[in-house]
Amino acid sequence: MSTQGLVTLLGNAQCHLRTSTNYNGVHTQFNAALNYKNKGTNTIDGSEAWCSSIVDTNQYIVAGCEVPRTFMCVALQGRGDHDQWVTSYKIRYSLDNVTWSEYRNGAAITGVTDRNTVVNHFFDTPIRARSIAIHPLTWNNHISLRCEFYTQPVQSSVTQVGADIYTGDNCALNTGSGKREVVVPVKFQFEFATLPKVALNFDQIDCTDATNQTRIGVQPRNITTKGFDCVFYTWNENKVYSLRADYIATALE
């Protein structure tokens, strides 16, 4: 399995980190990002990992997000400047930050065996949560770790609406017989990042037919991120003086 296409929470500063304890002010969660290294010229940058001040199974580091995320994978790494690492751990998570669940009912997940090798664990099924926590169970010398959480990209719905797409008076649908259409180009107010879905509805119909069967339609064609063609059409003996429609366009970005 691969992390390609997934979002790194710590690497992109998309979460808040909190820990049970910190060894001191330069051994905190701020040093917990995967592959973090200090400058090596002084002690200001601190340890190359988060290090707990208490060494027991009650320690944790938790990542909290503003909105729920779909977690796919967790990566673990040891402390880069000392022989300290977590050899096994469990995962807990919460959707509301009140009720917490244990991944695999709290079963141990294999950790790392050295300072710098990154070990990924892909979840059996994606975890939907706002917060997720690593709870070390066993360790080498001290509880110290660097980590990363991988999630699916967050998509939000972007919608634009438009009105008064008009065929014009006495349009081409008002003459002839059989299948006829009028195409009206429509430009969005702003360009979408991805291809939208477009829905149309009539807000004015001015037509007649000798058989009292009104046959008209409207549909989008040639949809792009910048606009589309609005196609008004009729068939048989219908005479359509004019049609007008509105649209709603929605995309996930």
UniProtKB/Swiss-Prot annotation:
One of its GO terms (molecular function) is N-acetylgalactosamine binding. It is found in: Cytoplasm. It holds the Pfam family H_lectin. A motif (Cell attachment site) lies at residues 79-81. Its main location: cytoplasm. InterPro entries: FA58C, Galactose-bd-like_sf, Galactose-binding_lectin, H-type_lectin_dom_sf, H-type_lectin_domain. One of its GO terms (biological process) is cell adhesion. Gene3D superfamilies: 2.60.40.2080, Galactose-binding domain-like. Tetramer of four different chains (A to D). Stalk cells. The gene is dscD-1. It comes from the Eukaryota. Galactose- and N-acetylgalactosamine-binding lectin. May play a role in cell-substratum adhesion rather than in cell-cell adhesion. May be necessary for the maintenance of normal elongate morphology during aggregation. It comes from Dictyostelium discoideum (Social amoeba). SUPFAM superfamilies: Agglutinin HPA-like (SSF141086), Galactose-binding domain-like (SSF49785). This is Discoidin-1 subunit D. Keywords: Acetylation, Cell adhesion, Cytoplasm, Lectin. One of its GO terms (cellular component) is protein complex involved in cell adhesion.
